[in-house]
Amino acid sequence: MQAKLLFTRLNFRRPSTTLRQFPLTCFLFHSKAFYSDLVTKEPLITPKRIINKTPGLNLSISERASNRLAEIYRNSKENLRISVESGGCHGFQYNLTLEPATKPDIKNDVKDKEFSDDLDDDDSKDIIYVLPEDKGRVIIDSKSLNILNNTTLTYTNELIGSSFKIINGSLKSSCGCGSSFDIEN
């Protein structure tokens, strides 16, 4: 009896809209289309320099990701390392880890001219994106960059937490975890 009385006092109204009125794409937050819109609206930074740049391969970094990386670097002197490995529910997964900045920063940062030809043939060399004003670095090995070519590193704030994400490029599909993906051939 009290529940019925409470229900009538609150005067619940039925919503005037139904889910059928909205296209399904409104609810696919992890879809490629959603992230494409996100990236086109978000400004990208130009790295101060790219060490060991490989022609034809690129990783874009959003302004939001750069700001967060600068904050991390300022507080703990750590850089972001991106790597890709096989696994996950879609075939590949990327790992984002923070590693301490060292002096000299990275083994591949300064090359000895005498051995530069030998180092250029190394498939595991690191490509280093130096953020503007030397406020951190993004480090990715050449094999991972080959898979993540033309993608964008961004930083998202969501209700469930904040995280770095890699979006666009040849990423065909991803899962709910946000780190597993499949690539287009």
UniProtKB/Swiss-Prot annotation:
Its main location: mitochondrion. It is found in: Mitochondrion matrix. SUPFAM superfamilies: HesB-like domain. One of its GO terms (molecular function) is 2 iron, 2 sulfur cluster binding. PROSITE patterns: HESB (PS01152). Present with 1560 molecules/cell in log phase SD medium. This is Iron-sulfur assembly protein 2. It comes from Saccharomyces cerevisiae (strain ATCC 204508 / S288c) (Baker's yeast).
